[in-house]
């Protein structure tokens, strides 16, 4: 993703938008509420995680919660995590894991077929008016990430 995106910041924003779409599609496919599932974007090794900042941009934070600059020199291998959001679980994780390819395809279709130009709460989450003025498209960034997810065979994805 880093090579296809002009910056880590844009890659991070793309992952956050993709996670938003995947979260909503997963809840629909699992016939659950979005609050039944949690979502997170972070490093697969647990060195950092991402949140949506008050400025609308993704922010990287280390495990203690301190903000990291997007050009942080550590490994940059973002991942999307969808999980059962109830303490002890209510049985959503295992069937959700088995539907990962369907979730990715559904999220890609959702974002591709949305009528918005830059992104909206129906596809990648709220988009700042300033993004629209600058032509910055969180929707396009999310489509890039989802396209990368969809292009790799599920058999290549990490196993639990």
Predicted regions and their residues:
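Extended, highly charged accessory segments
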Residues: 3-160
């Amino acid at each position: 993703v880093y090579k296809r995106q002009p910056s880590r910041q844009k890659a991070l924003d793309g992952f956050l938008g993709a996670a938003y779409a995947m979260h909503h599609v997963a809840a629909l496919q699992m016939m659950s509420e979005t609050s039944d599932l949690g979502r997170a974007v972070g490093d697969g090794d647990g060195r950092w995680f991402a949140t949506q900042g008050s400025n609308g941009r993704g922010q990287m934070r280390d495990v203690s919660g301190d903000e990291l600059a997007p050009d942080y020199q550590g490994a940059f291998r973002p991942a999307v995590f969808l999980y059962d959001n109830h303490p002890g679980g209510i049985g959503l994780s295992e069937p959700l894991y088995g539907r990962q390819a369907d979730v990715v395809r559904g999220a890609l279709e959702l974002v591709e077929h949305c009528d918005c130009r830059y992104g909206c709460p129906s596809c990648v989450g709220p988009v700042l008016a300033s993004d629209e003025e600058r032509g910055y498209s969180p929707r396009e960034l999310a489509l890039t990430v989802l396209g990368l997810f969809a292009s790799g065979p599920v058999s290549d994805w990490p196993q639990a």
